[in-house]
Amino acid sequence: MSKVLFIKASPLPNEVSRSSQVAETFMEEYKAKNPSDTVEELVLYNTEVPLLDLELMTAGRELQAGKAFTDLAPEVQQRLNAYNALTDQFLAADKYVFVFPLWNLGIPPLLKAYVDTFVIAGKSFRYTEHGPEALLKDKKAILIHGSGGIYSAGQTSSFTHGEPYLRTILQFIGIEVAPTIFVEGIDHNPSKEAEIVAAAKAVAHESVAEF
């Protein structure tokens, strides 16, 4: 039995977000084929995702120096608890499904803040004399990525830092990343929206078998 963490990184409701619609299709198919697995849904825009800032970095250094957690300011304790809860939740999962849009050639800022909660030296990777070593080597992920333009291939593929970044950072910590499901090009061809979404859903159905 596997534990699946379904991470939604769009503030838009499902009826508006085409990538979320495709992700729901993927999850429905996955649950049907893997009834014994457990699925936990994490909606980032409905979740407190603490930003890794000076306050948290200072608190981390103080704790490493021996300061008691209870001696931190109450609001700092609360932020650290929220941060650590996200870390623990991520590390406890076996599989990850990320659905996210392309914003200005990158990922949403809240998704980047979330990435910082689990890419942590000593937890998801470690430094050795031979370089960094991944610690999450028996886990899998799949990315479902929406964009108004087409960035998965062609001349514009070199412009985007969204899907390549998330894929690379997950591989860096040892996670095997399946081929991405792209939901793209609707802003270029609005009249083909239904066709594009249907094609992406077909890929989603096929992708479940290998996940």
Over which residues does each language-model region extend?
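Short, acidic/small-residue loops that bind anionic groups at enzyme active sites
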Residues: 118-132
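N-terminal beta1-alpha1-beta2 submodule of the flavodoxin-like/Rossmannoid cofactor-binding fold
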Residues: 1-100, 105-109, 113-116, 120, ...
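Cofactor-binding loop segments of dinucleotide-utilizing enzymes, especially the Rossmann-like FAD-
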Residues: 9, 146, 183
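Residues at the starts of beta-strands that form the adenosine-phosphate
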Residues: 3, 38, 139-141, 177
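Short, well-ordered alpha-helix to beta-strand connector turns
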Residues: 93-94, 138, 175
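Short histidine/acidic/glycine/proline-rich micro-motifs that form metal-
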Residues: 11-14, 149-150, 187-188
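Glycine-rich phosphate/pyrophosphate-binding loop and the adjoining helix
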Residues: 28, 153-211
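Short, glycine-/small-residue-rich phosphate/pyrophosphate-handling segment
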Residues: 128-172
